[in-house]
């Protein structure tokens, strides 16, 4: 779960980024301050608006840097398409697509609308062929 300023906007952003869907009734009033991002039956991410309900750790969005030391890491099986979605969203790219030699996969590091660092990575070993050719 991450705290965000605008649940509806963040939900749309992550749905596009991850080729996922929001759970439940899109018109439910609760969706203004909480949403779940799903891929099939799998819960991928929860979003909660800052300063709502009785969650003491979700108060004061400007008290400190958001997500310092936290990476939202998603393995995607469609890495090239995911990079295309990043470009369409106009996301701030921290690190362009590259091969991480340890897990032998490709990664792109970006920032979401609330300044959280998001990493999209292909499955481990996916880039093994390219490493042998270089």
Model-derived segments and their meaning:
Residues 1-45, 50:
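Core segments of cupin and vicinal oxygen chelate
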Residues 42-55, 65, 69, 118-127:
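Membrane-topology and secretion signals of cell-surface/extracellular proteins
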Residues 1-5, 25, 34-39, 58-134:
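Vicinal oxygen chelate
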Residues 56-60, 130-132:
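A short, polar/proline- and glycine-enriched secondary-structure boundary/capping micro-motif
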Residues 1-11, 22-23, 69-74, 121-134:
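N-terminal beta-strand motif that seeds the catalytic metal site of vicinal oxygen chelate
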Residues 27-29, 52, 78, 100-101:
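Short beta->alpha connector loops
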């Amino acid at each position: 779960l991450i705290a965000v300023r605008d649940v509806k906007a963040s939900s749309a952003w992550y749905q596009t980024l991850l080729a996922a869907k929001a759970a439940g009734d899109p018109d439910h009033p609760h969706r203004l301050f909480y949403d779940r991002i799903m891929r099939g039956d799998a819960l991928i991410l929860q979003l909660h608006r800052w300063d709502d309900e009785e969650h003491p750790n979700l108060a004061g969005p400007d008290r400190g840097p958001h997500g310092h030391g936290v990476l939202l890491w998603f393995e995607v099986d469609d890495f090239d398409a995911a990079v295309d979605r990043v470009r369409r969203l106009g996301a701030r790219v921290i690190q362009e697509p590259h091969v991480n030699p340890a897990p032998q996969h490709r990664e792109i590091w970006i920032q979401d609308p609330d300044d959280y660092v998001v990493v999209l990575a292909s499955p481990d070993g996916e880039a093994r062929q390219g490493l042998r050719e270089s």
